[in-house]
């Protein structure tokens, strides 16, 4: 009898946890194209980004301007364009970096 009650409590808790997770994922806004994809389930675990993924660079000042050599260096981005979040840290291709 006690095990039946315990099982029903566990099932209720799992349902409420699932509902809460769905609500959190629906409210969360992401600029990451992988997370925004329709192929990703709403019930997924939070995607793991590297530690600087959510860091905002909009208010940081660059001490020394570094020449941009990306593939899109010739494109001028407007102020309203957000960089997409990366799932891996940027590569440092320096020999002694």
Swiss-Prot record:
It comes from the Eukaryota. Belongs to the SPATA45 family. This is Spermatogenesis-associated protein 45. The gene is SPATA45.
